[in-house]
Amino acid sequence: MTDEIKKENAPKKLSIQRRTKTTVSGTSTTGKSKEVQVEVRKKRTVTTDLERKAQEQAKLKAKEEAEKRAAEEKLAEKAKREAEKAKAEQIKVEKAKAEQAKASKKNVDVEKEKRRAEEAELRRKADEVARQKAEEKAQKAAEEAKRYADFDDSDNDNGKLDDYSDYHLTSSYALEAENEEERRNENRGRSKNKVVKAKKGGRDDENGNKNERQSDRRNQKDVKGKGKHAKKASALQQAFTKPAQVAKADVVIGETITVAELAAKMAVKATEIIKTMMKMGEMVTINQVIDQDTAQLVAEEMGHKVILRKENELEEMVMEDRDVNAEKVHRAPVVTIMGHVDHGKTSLLDYIRKAKVAAGEAGGITQHIGAYHVETNDGKMITFLDTPGHAAFTSMRARGAKATDIVVLVVAADDGVMPQTIEAIQHAKAANAPLVVAVNKIDKPEANPDRVEQELLQHEVISEKFGGDVQFVPVSAKKGLGIDDLLEAILLQSEVLELTAVKDGMASGVVIESYLDKGRGPVATILVQSGTLNRGDIVLCGFEYGRVRAMRDENGKDIQSAGPSIPVEVLGLSGVPAAGDEATVVRDEKKAREVALYRQGKFREVKLARQQKAKLENMFSNMAEGDVAELNVIVKADVQGSVEAIVQALHELSTAEVKVKVVGSGVGGITETDATLAAASNAIMVGFNVRADATARRVIENENIDLRYYSIIYELLNEIKAAMSGMLQPEFKQEIIGLAEVRDVFRHPKFGAIAGCMVTEGLVKRNNPIRVLRDNVVIFEGELESLRRFKDDVSEVRSGMECGIGVKNYNDVKVGDQIEVFEVVEVKRAI
């Protein structure tokens, strides 16, 4: 074994190198002798005897392999003949059995089954024998081919230099054997026997053999696979059909969307949408918010299918998740007291409640909505809402009318119908609320109830006396006359209306009033309209939400629940809701918070859209108007209703020249933040029934801010008007103070034409502007250059005196002209 290894490792080639050094003498270009050393190298490669013997042995083995292959073919042919012979014998047996089956009619079915089984068994055995023989032969051929191929590969590298003919001969034998084996494997459809080349030689040979084996496996798999994994013929051709039109996806549009967002959803440029809307007659910018209908028209115009999405799906789901099929019961009427200033609304309600609250109200005006419920003598209940009587509280009175069932219109018998009385009638009609007229102050000597009925006829308030359906009840809030009759009239009207509500279930109502209490936080007065509001319920109220921590009635008493038509003060909301917001009890606090946040975001979006629209629409008009003076005001009041009413009244004071800008408003006392805002915006601070804390007062003093306190709205509006009047641009009026008639004209080398005049009216002053009149037409307007009486320069000349007048830059004075002297007077303006 060791000798064989030594033989294998013995060198197969022998290289002989020979070096010869020689010195050559020569003459350089300069004539000097020069010696040059020359080295001659010779190399000769001699092939060893071992290599020649290996080549001869390979030839012999290749010849033997060919002979063996011929013998194997003979054996295969012999096996084939044997199989055919067996098949012929099988056919004979089948024929014999068939004849036997024909002869025997009784056992036909049994014989058929037996024959089929025997046929299958014979066929299986024949196939098994043939398959085994073929596999054995193929295995032997593969092993022989593998051995010679490996030997051939190793000899190819060694015999390239000396004998090319032997190389081609040896390689052809191995290649032919390999190809023959591949053909057999392909014919049998088998992929188990793979032709693998030996790992011999360097790394390049290993990589090459590995690639060849992978290629062989892929080729055999391609031939065999004909099922779903069969590899198709690669034509290296790909086809791409260009779509006939652009694929347009569905566009989901919410209630509002910006132009940029719509362009992104439609996968087009925003300029395309702007062009489309310009064709439709709309001018928009890329960041402008458009409504759902406009976005739908634009998208459909550009060929997209639109899917409209309701953004308030969660809100609707929360609102609809309520108790159903609850039984309705009769409820107490909600009555709103309306009327003119000082006609006795609060005094009337005060007498009904048997509590003195009207005396403390400033100026006799109810400053914010109060809600009370009382019981009549027969045990029935009535809820009263008291709205302010001043015209500035229009929004509050309208809000009270929306929450009410019956309106009691209080009219003083001695005063008659007044402007606020007419407004109250209009609000009642807008709310479709029936009227009951209470003619107050009938105890006064000058009272005339019939005149009140006559005046109300002009406003379509027809009493039952004249064939109408409005009840007129004469009362006296001071002496208590007719109060029971008024309550009976209210109950009678409520029976006609058949007022009902769900008593058991989740409550809903409306916010009558709200304010921020320093100790208790946000406080909201809620009128329950249906269901029962319990302590601990989760209430969603406009932009705010919260759990009811405490409930109090109008007397400040803690209560646990409140049914329909009961007003209560609720604590526990996240913020101060707006008066008039709908209050609803919901099941889930988390969903209530989500709805409240959604409403806040929606309000901001709508507000932004309005601002952008106003900017676009008023851009050119604002440029034409120029600068408009603005009076910045910060309003703080005790309740939300007063804040809204004051802000509305201030906006109505705005004129074309001076505008009132409310930079901040809120409920509660004046804080340091309010004072800082006023200093930054140069605003007037207005406190209505509130005061500034110590920190705010310190900022106000340091910044010299104008802070004013009020308890009556008349005084507030009058002082704001005065401040606005001071901001108006003053008017200038020209007053003629003197008139002089030209009697003669003199020439002066220094002053030019000098007019000798007689002062006919008023007074002529040197420094005042003048006009030159000719035939009562102004021909020049300028100023006097000199004024002399005789030789003396004077400052003024009175009527009836003569004087010399030199007009500056004007020498065309003629006899008969009139010189009119005037002065410009500033006239203060007022709103």
Swiss-Prot record:
<feature type="compositionally biased region" description="Basic residues">
    <location>
        <begin position="190"/>
        <end position="200"/>
    </location>
</feature>
<feature type="binding site">
    <location>
        <begin position="339"/>
        <end position="346"/>
    </location>
    <ligand>
        <name>GTP</name>
    </ligand>
</feature>
<dbReference type="InterPro" id="IPR023115">
    <property type="entry name" value="TIF_IF2_dom3"/>
</dbReference>
<feature type="compositionally biased region" description="Basic and acidic residues">
    <location>
        <begin position="157"/>
        <end position="166"/>
    </location>
</feature>
<feature type="region of interest" description="G4">
    <location>
        <begin position="440"/>
        <end position="443"/>
    </location>
</feature>
<dbReference type="InterPro" id="IPR015760">
    <property type="entry name" value="TIF_IF2"/>
</dbReference>
<keyword id="KW-0342">GTP-binding</keyword>
<feature type="region of interest" description="G5">
    <location>
        <begin position="476"/>
        <end position="478"/>
    </location>
</feature>
<dbReference type="InterPro" id="IPR000178">
    <property type="entry name" value="TF_IF2_bacterial-like"/>
</dbReference>
<dbReference type="Pfam" id="PF08364">
    <property type="entry name" value="IF2_assoc"/>
</dbReference>
<dbReference type="InterPro" id="IPR013575">
    <property type="entry name" value="IF2_assoc_dom_bac"/>
</dbReference>
<keyword id="KW-0963">Cytoplasm</keyword>
<dbReference type="InterPro" id="IPR006847">
    <property type="entry name" value="IF2_N"/>
</dbReference>
<dbReference type="GO" id="GO:0003743">
    <property type="term" value="F:translation initiation factor activity"/>
</dbReference>
<dbReference type="GO" id="GO:0003924">
    <property type="term" value="F:GTPase activity"/>
</dbReference>
<feature type="region of interest" description="G1">
    <location>
        <begin position="339"/>
        <end position="346"/>
    </location>
</feature>
<keyword id="KW-0648">Protein biosynthesis</keyword>
<feature type="compositionally biased region" description="Basic and acidic residues">
    <location>
        <begin position="201"/>
        <end position="225"/>
    </location>
</feature>
<dbReference type="InterPro" id="IPR004161">
    <property type="entry name" value="EFTu-like_2"/>
</dbReference>
<feature type="binding site">
    <location>
        <begin position="440"/>
        <end position="443"/>
    </location>
    <ligand>
        <name>GTP</name>
    </ligand>
</feature>
<dbReference type="Pfam" id="PF03144">
    <property type="entry name" value="GTP_EFTU_D2"/>
</dbReference>
<feature type="region of interest" description="Disordered">
    <location>
        <begin position="1"/>
        <end position="236"/>
    </location>
</feature>
<protein>
    <recommendedName>
        <fullName>Translation initiation factor IF-2</fullName>
    </recommendedName>
</protein>
<feature type="compositionally biased region" description="Basic and acidic residues">
    <location>
        <begin position="1"/>
        <end position="11"/>
    </location>
</feature>
<dbReference type="Pfam" id="PF11987">
    <property type="entry name" value="IF-2"/>
</dbReference>
<dbReference type="InterPro" id="IPR044145">
    <property type="entry name" value="IF2_II"/>
</dbReference>
<feature type="region of interest" description="G3">
    <location>
        <begin position="386"/>
        <end position="389"/>
    </location>
</feature>
<dbReference type="InterPro" id="IPR053905">
    <property type="entry name" value="EF-G-like_DII"/>
</dbReference>
<feature type="binding site">
    <location>
        <begin position="386"/>
        <end position="390"/>
    </location>
    <ligand>
        <name>GTP</name>
    </ligand>
</feature>
<feature type="domain" description="tr-type G">
    <location>
        <begin position="330"/>
        <end position="500"/>
    </location>
</feature>
<feature type="region of interest" description="G2">
    <location>
        <begin position="364"/>
        <end position="368"/>
    </location>
</feature>
<dbReference type="InterPro" id="IPR000795">
    <property type="entry name" value="T_Tr_GTP-bd_dom"/>
</dbReference>
<dbReference type="InterPro" id="IPR027417">
    <property type="entry name" value="P-loop_NTPase"/>
</dbReference>
<comment type="similarity">
    <text>Belongs to the TRAFAC class translation factor GTPase superfamily. Classic translation factor GTPase family. IF-2 subfamily.</text>
</comment>
<dbReference type="Pfam" id="PF22042">
    <property type="entry name" value="EF-G_D2"/>
</dbReference>
<comment type="function">
    <text>One of the essential components for the initiation of protein synthesis. Protects formylmethionyl-tRNA from spontaneous hydrolysis and promotes its binding to the 30S ribosomal subunits. Also involved in the hydrolysis of GTP during the formation of the 70S ribosomal complex.</text>
</comment>
<dbReference type="InterPro" id="IPR036925">
    <property type="entry name" value="TIF_IF2_dom3_sf"/>
</dbReference>
<keyword id="KW-0547">Nucleotide-binding</keyword>
<dbReference type="InterPro" id="IPR009000">
    <property type="entry name" value="Transl_B-barrel_sf"/>
</dbReference>
<dbReference type="Pfam" id="PF04760">
    <property type="entry name" value="IF2_N"/>
</dbReference>
<keyword id="KW-0396">Initiation factor</keyword>
<dbReference type="GO" id="GO:0005829">
    <property type="term" value="C:cytosol"/>
</dbReference>
